[in-house]
């Protein structure tokens, strides 16, 4: 009897241990599920097979058909930089526009000319050694960031303002600003308006989906003026409305207003740009987030135009610097520089050819040449877009 009782006690104890073990496993599993951070969606799923209790293998591969919840602006690693793709394809797909005088216009002959168009060429010259290896893609204002995010274009060079939201939520990475602008207002010369404060109870027309729209409303509120801010899809529609008397004033970046004024049907003298500038509009190229290699390549391509002007190097004299003894210029042009271990060409690891700056200057020009060709004829002055040494704010980091 005692033996049977002992056996029964041992059996009960064994069952208790098994139950405790099972309970412990469940609690541990619950704790693990609660404290393990969610898997980063940017990382590939673990494809290793787990072993089931019956000895078979269970496939733990994540469902690859699940929707991608990556938010705009969140970095997505694809494993290949746009720089590699551009160099493989031999062309830069540059998002721009074809109807903004001074910046980007498609001529009847099919040529893209203008300040922005030339900076597309600057990028191609730096990356590919061929300034004409550009596919110009005309993108609408409302679609420009979608085109950038979808991969339809490699870079956006379309008089686009660098803002916090575009840098964040829109998923763009802005590089070196190539034109510092500000918002202004243009009116008919015979309107009687001489200053922004004269504009009360008027209709101010802007392009929708731009910084201009919000800035105009904010400026009216700041000055206590009654403005009806009317938004149109593109500047061409504003011009039509302006000509039809549906707009009392036209607000945009001063550079854009200057461009449209230069081609206005009744002549530039029929329009006046009021003197006040009421916003900051840093314009420059943008690339997709998450690709630092491509961003730095585009960044240094733009900087090369600024540094070349500072060195006094332009498309007409670049060859004369072949024999320069200035090590800073030697490094910049991809020439050999004497060092402790002999002569060597600087390769800073940008993923660009060592002579990229020389290609930019030879094939397109320095910043001053690009500005003088496209923006000076509109009546725009360098102003703050002059070199830092000439009273402006353009400045290139040391190339070393």
Enumerate the predicted regions with their spans.
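Extended ligand-binding regions for polar small-molecule ligands
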Residues: 72-77, 121, 125, 189-193, ...
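Short helix-initiation/N-cap motifs at beta->coil->alpha
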Residues: 79-80, 134-146, 191, 229-244
């Amino acid at each position: 009897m005692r033996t049977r009782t002992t056996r029964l006690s041992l059996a009960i104890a064994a069952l208790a241990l098994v139950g405790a073990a099972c309970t412990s496993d469940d609690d541990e599993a619950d704790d693990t599920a609660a404290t393990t951070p969610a898997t980063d969606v940017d990382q590939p799923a673990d494809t290793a097979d787990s072993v089931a209790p019956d000895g078979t293998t269970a496939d733990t591969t994540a469902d690859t058909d699940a929707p991608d919840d990556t938010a705009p602006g969140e970095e997505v690693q694809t494993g290949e930089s746009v720089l590699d793709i551009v160099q493989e394809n031999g062309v830069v797909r540059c998002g721009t526009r074809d109807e903004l005088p001074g910046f980007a216009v498609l001529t009847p002959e099919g040529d893209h000319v203008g300040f922005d168009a030339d900076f597309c060429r600057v990028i191609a010259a730096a990356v590919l050694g061929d300034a004409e290896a550009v596919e110009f893609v005309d993108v609408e204002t409302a679609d420009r960031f979608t085109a950038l995010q979808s991969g339809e274009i490699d870079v956006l060079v379309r008089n686009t303002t660098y803002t916090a939201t575009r840098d964040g939520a829109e998923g763009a990475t802005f590089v070196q600003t190539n034109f510092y602008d500000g918002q202004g207002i243009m009116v008919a010369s015979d309107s009687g308006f001489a200053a922004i404060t004269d504009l009360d109870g008027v209709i101010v027309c802007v392009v929708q989906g731009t910084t201009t729209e919000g800035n105009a409303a904010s400026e009216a509120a700041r000055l206590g003026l009654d403005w009806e801010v009317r938004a149109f899809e593109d500047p061409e529609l504003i011009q039509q409305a302006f000509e039809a008397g549906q707009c009392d004033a036209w607000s945009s970046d001063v550079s854009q207003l200057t461009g449209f004024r230069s081609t206005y049907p009744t002549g530039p003298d029929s329009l006046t740009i009021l003197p006040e500038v009421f916003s900051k509009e840093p314009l420059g190229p943008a690339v997709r987030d998450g690709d630092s290699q491509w961003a730095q390549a585009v960044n240094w391509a733009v900087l090369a135009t600024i540094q070349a002007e500072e060195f006094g190097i332009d498309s007409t004299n670049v060859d004369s610097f072949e024999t320069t003894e200035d090590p800073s210029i030697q490094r910049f042009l991809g020439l050999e520089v004497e060092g402790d271990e002999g002569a060597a060409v600087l390769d800073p690891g940008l993923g660009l050819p060592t002579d990229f700056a020389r290609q930019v200057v030879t094939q397109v020009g320095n910043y001053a040449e690009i500005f003088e060709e496209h923006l000076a004829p509109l009546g725009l002055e360098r102003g703050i877009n002059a070199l830092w040494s000439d009273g402006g704010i353009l400045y290139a980091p040391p190339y070393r």
